[in-house]
């Protein structure tokens, strides 16, 4: 013991060990403890220290990470860092954290996942990593290879006075639905926030500031850089043609909201209904339901003010399903949510296989705007309305071509069918109508009468009455005609008709017919 104490005091400060482990006091203490117990290994520890110093000099720009010890910090914090190191199992932490030329970096970015802190966002040029670097220690905290990114979302942050955007990076096996292969750790999603405005600290790899042009915002710059580096996906943003909330942003008046507030258990979050799937965020665990992973969607606990949304999800490589319930959704958003679900056929479990086979994806050659313009719902609805209007116009043209005012009365060659002409001819004896026509009253919105069977030569007056408030005119017209029939049963026949294929409550055609 005395010999060990003498040797320990003699080797308390070895220059090589002091230089090599100056930044690691706990590791340096363990080395000296080992030397005190086994002083014969002093030359070995000196050689290790010298080699470590040479590595530090060689990789001066890449900081050495602390060795994990029981005194370094809470176990939960270590797990967070380990899970966030990389999303791909093919890359080691050394690949992610190695010194590499940068294509883009942006300082003072507020990250929410997997760590809540301000970091520098980096995109490497050669290896293609998206990573976050500590601005004080210069250590890479976490990151992911761009080839392992499955979904990228850019979403407005709800309920903020200042407009901000959250970028959500969802790696493979990191969507909360699909589990990684056995023995591998599930990667965590990355979420960071940028303000709506010009970027203050965005630079290219050579240090040139980016976004100095007029109209360039931080959101535009980051989205552009991501799209340039992503090969399997593109940045997806909300689209009002997919879903927009019935309630505007509470903190930013006049701005549309694309989210729905909901609870998963006791955890509050927001649902976003996007062109590639449904996101629930922005707290852990973030969940993204891609269309191909949705088995079916249903409603439960539908009350006067709220409802619950149940999503049955099926992983891509498994037949086992899991059901997640999102509660306390405002009833005001039911119509928009239901239209979105029906548009993509998400309410029908029998279509799940077709969705998986089709694998909904706007991330090909088309941009998000182009993909939204090609969506079936709005375009199809517009074309149907145009088609109905065209058919009405065609039928009106046919009636005008067939109409011959002189065929009823050879003495009347004016060719007029106006109300004024009908008044002038009212005193004359009229020939009975020979068309074999069946006339009657059709209330607005009821089943169409066979308008084409009404002979145009018997029509005095034809007009169109829009739906809505004008339908009251149809009922008033009915009453007047019934009164006239009571006074003079031989005066007129009448009909309210709509063209076949015309949407009900859209157009009502009114005809006053000669007997």
Curated annotation (Swiss-Prot):
* Domain of life of the organism encoding this protein: Eukaryota
Listed Polar residues bias regions:
83-92
Q: What GO MF annotations does this protein's record show?
A: DNA binding; histone binding; nucleosome binding
Q: Where is this region: Disordered?
A: 62-95, 362-439
Q: Which InterPro entries match?
A: PH-like_dom_sf, RTT106/SPT16-like_middle_dom, RTT106/SSRP1_HistChap/FACT
Start-end of Acidic residues biased regions: 371-383, 392-411, 418-432
**Pfam family for this entry, one:** Rttp106-like_middle
Native organism is: Aspergillus oryzae (strain ATCC 42149 / RIB 40)
Compartment list: Nucleus; Chromosome
Q: Say if the entry is tagged with keyword Membrane.
A: no
Family per record: Belongs to the RTT106 family.
Provide the assembly information.
Interacts with histones H3 and H4.
Q: Which SMART domains match?
A: Rtt106
Q: What is this protein called?
A: Histone chaperone rtt106
| Record-level GO cellular component terms | chromosome; nucleus
Q: State what this protein does.
A: Histones H3 and H4 chaperone involved in the nucleosome formation and heterochromatin silencing. Required for the deposition of H3K56ac-carrying H3-H4 complex onto newly-replicated DNA. Plays a role in the transcriptional regulation of the cell-cycle dependent histone genes by creating a repressive structure at the core histone gene promoter.
Q: Provide this UniProt record's keywords sorted from A to Z.
A: Chaperone, Chromosome, DNA-binding, Nucleus, Transcription, Transcription regulation
